Amino acid sequence: MRSHYCGDVNKSHVGQEVTLVGWVNRSRDLGGVVFLDLRDREGLVQVVYDPDLPEVFAVASTLRAEFCVQVKGVVRARPDSQVNGQMKTGEIEVLGKALTIINAADPLPLSLDNYQNNSEEQRLKYRYLDLRRPEMAQRLMFRAKVTSAVRRFLDSNGFLDIETPILTKATPEGARDYLVPSRTYKGQFFALPQSPQLFKQLLMMSGFDRYYQIVKCFRDEDLRADRQPEFTQIDIETSFMTSEQVMAKTEEMMRGLFLEMLNVDLGEFPRMTYNEAMRRFGSDKPDLRNPLELVDIADLLKEVEFAVFSAPANDEEGRVAVLRIPGGAALSRKQIDDYTKFVGIYGAKGLAWMKINDLSLGLEGIQSPVLKFLNESIVNEIISRTGAQTGDIILFGADQATVVAESMGALRLKAGEDFSLLQGEWRPLWVVDFPMFEKINGNFHAVHHPFTAPRGVTAAELEANPANRVSDAYDMVLNGCELGGGSVRIHNQEMQSAVFRILGITDDEAKEKFGFLLEALRYGTPPHAGLAFGLDRIIMLMTGASSIRDVMAFPKTTTAACPLTNAPGFANPQQLAELGIAVVEKAVKTEG
């Protein structure tokens, strides 16, 4: 039905007859000549119909936005005065000779030109129309090229694309599972996989050595801007490779991807330990474009007569840290109060501050409600450590170390945006040496997942002192977003059983949930390691989209619903009866 895509017609085609198909982006009658902007996935081209062909002209005069049409015509160069530098095809136009309306279009329920006026509900309900917008089409085409580039790299490096089951068994991976009832086994359920973690480990035990999969994963969790109930991973696993080798290979892949797709050289990725990241930035995924850093000052405040500072300064689990904001002395009291409310979201009880109005005047040039509790030597040392200058403000976080890290880390990001401090476009890094476990309500939980290997200890040593052990894990971070995370896996039964015990998983529970894994570990399991990247997040960053919903063809809303299909929906009674399921409480369908 066509000879060329609309966006591919150029000056080399002048004089040629072309056949184009697509949608009417815009149609206008100017002085007896119809100008038609025809659109397909590759772009726009202008088609001109004049009255010399009355029958064709009559049809062209009836066209409205989003009619699906076929155009036949001759390519001609535009006069210099009419060249449109904003269009890829702006040097040419097509003189229409024939026109077929393939399908007319009713008036659209949403605007494709002024899409900012469309609600997200509208955009998702009429997603097939929203995806006609060039911006959306370009993102999905970009995504297709990224997945193709990833496959080429992994294929050329000996990785095998192997599918793993979608219907599987529930395993504790941090989020709720989506359950699928079994008709054959009444009262029993499959779970949709949160990741192919155990299957890819089993593939290493099977001897496949290098595996990858671009795979759908499912998590029934609370949604945020960068979360969806179903999402796509670039899943990778290797045998006989160390964590250093896995990081080197996947860094090579990511650097090549950015160079090919964006012509950006990311350079060599720096390394940073988890402890350093939390200390300096209050986050295990620091945005290195932001020059602001947290500075510890607890050692200066142990003896001050101000319990807000001295109590956490003398508490082993407490922390006092400050954040210097260049130019922040200009903040009004209301703006400081707004920052105080902001850190309160993260559990902080307040936000002390110190304005450096004039450094040359000593204490006289400093304004702060806590200045009366601090002597001159303490103030001078705080100024020295932070590098504060006249016109700056120093903000104080004093609380439990976890609260200080989270609240001041979030404030660092907000201040960086508010004061336009971000430097550079792309700042990648590896974060390494994560703790094996974290304590929540007195119980140990795996920081990554329960199959992550510790670094440099035996099973007995791990059980004897689990709190201070470091995992052989690594996260790739870019601009404050975790692109992917991975680890060396446990490859012997003794260590895996020890980790289960530390996590409070009884032997019976371990056998019931992971018996197949524990048995597999008895039969010559090779050392193995891997990593999984969030494809949606990578595309979001590379395209500058504000949400992963804008780089997925048919995403869910923030309430995990699909306005297009009205999913989830109620099952009919016969289906439920076959599954042995009775709905005991009336379900309320949430719009949104």
Swiss-Prot record:
GO cellular component, one term: cytoplasm
InterPro entries referenced in this protein's UniProt entry, alphabetically: Aa-tRNA-synt_II, aa-tRNA-synth_II, aa-tRNA-synth_II/BPL/LPL, Asp-tRNA-ligase_1, Asp-tRNA-ligase_1_N, Asp/Asn-tRNA-synth_IIb, AspRS_core, GAD-like_sf
Highest taxon listed in the record's lineage: Bacteria
Alphabetic keyword roster: Aminoacyl-tRNA synthetase, ATP-binding, Cytoplasm, Ligase, Nucleotide-binding, Protein biosynthesis
A Pfam family per the record: tRNA_anti-codon
Catalytic activity: tRNA(Asp) + L-aspartate + ATP = L-aspartyl-tRNA(Asp) + AMP + diphosphate
Quaternary structure and interacting proteins, as annotated: Homodimer.
Name the record gives this protein: Aspartate--tRNA ligase
Similarity-based family: Belongs to the class-II aminoacyl-tRNA synthetase family. Type 1 subfamily.
Gene: aspS
Enzyme class: ligase
A molecular-function term among this protein's GO annotations: aspartate-tRNA ligase activity
Binding site for ATP: 219-221, 228, 482, 534-537
Subcellular location: Cytoplasm
CDD domains given in the database record: AspRS_core, EcAspRS_like_N
EC numbers for this chain: 6.1.1.12
